[in-house]
């Protein structure tokens, strides 16, 4: 489980940053007549698995957020304790550590199509300040998803009415309560429960330039 994490970001005052897909993985190789098969996770939280460069669990969550949405935040408050989200779908149990955060300001476009690149987080001066570097990805097995920014209550209602009924089991209801609790803590300025993180995009050749300058 520590190798899988996601980031549920809220844009003030009450909108969630999500992904929207139109078809299922199982439809990828199906005949054309079957391409309208329902995707059981039509609306999903940006998430993924740890890679060798992720030193901390929340770094996996942040990196996957940037890779899957094609956006990054200039700064955000992220709740220190993640929620263990799990569900069982078609006999398979999924489990992710989901961090909940609040974006300060706007999301910034990385100017690249989601999942066509990998992200490397380079630590900055402070512990949760990162520079992000993009590297083209040679292969992409992800299905196409688009960015969906929707009101929190609309997302909760959609999940309750359309998506959760397709699962054998899930603790999404508890997760929704967790999100509400985190948002209430933020609104009440209980910022000691959050850590402050910043991201800054750099050119791919910036580290080489910096290294060259240091040698002069």
UniProtKB/Swiss-Prot annotation:
It catalyses: ADP-D-ribose + H2O = D-ribose 5-phosphate + AMP + 2 H(+). It comes from Autographa californica nuclear polyhedrosis virus (AcMNPV). GO terms for cellular component: host cell cytoplasm; host cell nucleus. Its EC number is 3.6.1.13. Plays an important role in virus replication most probably through its hydrolyzing ADP-ribose activity in host cells. May function in viral DNA replication or transcription directly, or by removing toxic substances or metabolic intermediates. GO terms for molecular function: ADP-ribose diphosphatase activity; metal ion binding. Keywords: Host cytoplasm, Host nucleus, Hydrolase, Metal-binding. It is found in: Host cytoplasm; Host nucleus. This is Protein ADP-ribose pyrophosphatase ORF38. A motif (Nudix box) lies at residues 48-70. Residues 1-177 form the Nudix hydrolase domain. Its main location: host cell. The lineage of its organism: Viruses, Viruses incertae sedis, Naldaviricetes, Lefavirales, Baculoviridae.
């Amino acid at each position: 489980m520590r190798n899988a994490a996601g980031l549920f970001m809220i844009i003030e005052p009450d909108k969630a940053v999500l992904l929207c897909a139109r078809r299922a993985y199982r439809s990828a190789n199906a005949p054309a007549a079957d391409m309208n098969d329902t995707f059981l996770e039509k609306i999903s939280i940006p998430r993924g698995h740890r890679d060798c460069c992720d030193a901390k669990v929340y770094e996996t969550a942040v990196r996957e957020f940037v890779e899957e949405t094609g956006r990054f935040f200039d700064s955000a408050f992220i709740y220190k304790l993640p929620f263990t989200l799990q569900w069982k779908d078609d006999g398979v149990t999924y489990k992710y550590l989901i961090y909940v955060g609040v974006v300060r300001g706007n999301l910034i476009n990385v100017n690249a199509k989601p999942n066509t690149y990998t992200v490397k987080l380079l630590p900055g001066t402070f512990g949760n300040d990162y520079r992000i570097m993009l590297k083209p990805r040679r292969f992409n097995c992800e299905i196409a998803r688009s960015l969906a920014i929707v009101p929190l209550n609309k997302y909760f209602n959609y999940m309750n009415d359309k998506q959760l009924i397709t699962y054998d089991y899930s603790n999404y209801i508890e997760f929704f309560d967790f999100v509400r609790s985190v948002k209430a803590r933020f609104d009440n300025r209980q910022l000691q429960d959050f850590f402050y993180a910043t991201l800054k995009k750099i050119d791919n050749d910036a580290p080489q330039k910096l290294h060259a300058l240091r040698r002069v």
